[in-house]
Amino acid sequence: MKQIIISLLFLGLISGFTQPTSVKYPVVIKFQSICCGVPDDAPLNEMIKKFKKQYKIKTLSTTRIGPMGKEGEYYLAFSLKGMTAKQKLNFKKKIRSLVPTMKDKGVATLEENITINAADLPSRATSTTVNF
């Protein structure tokens, strides 16, 4: 009986420390390759730099998920935590106008309110936090 209780407590502790399997993001930019790599993220970096300065935001964090394919494809998933509702709307508006112009090597696409499930990602894909 004692071993059963200890085993159940141990299993309960282990399950409490597991990573969430899916996360919902309000904004996800997918950098995809057509043949020769992914688009340059310099225009995005510049837009984020200006946005931070305009709204006096100290840090804007995103999750970089990848590699998603053989040619360096990856996702940038923005949680938009710490922004006001107005800032979120303006950020999405700026992203919507910027992303279609990012076509130098591949293509960048924007998806909103997307849930990313860890089980659906390639086995070699990792998630890292990127601060702008």
Name each model feature, range by range.
Residues Q54-K94:
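Short, intrinsically disordered low-complexity segments
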Residues V23-C36, E71-S79:
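Acidic/histidine-rich, surface-exposed loop or edge segments in extracytoplasmic proteins
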Residues K93-F132:
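C-terminal partner/receptor-binding element of secreted or periplasmic proteins
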Residues D41-T59:
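Short, flexible N-terminal segments of the mature chain
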Residues Q32-P43, G82-A85:
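Short, surface-exposed ligand-recognition loops at beta-strand->loop->(often short) alpha-helix junctions
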Residues M1-V23:
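Bacterial Sec-dependent N-terminal signal peptides
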Residues P43-K49, K88-V99:
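Short amphipathic alpha-helices in soluble, non-transmembrane regions
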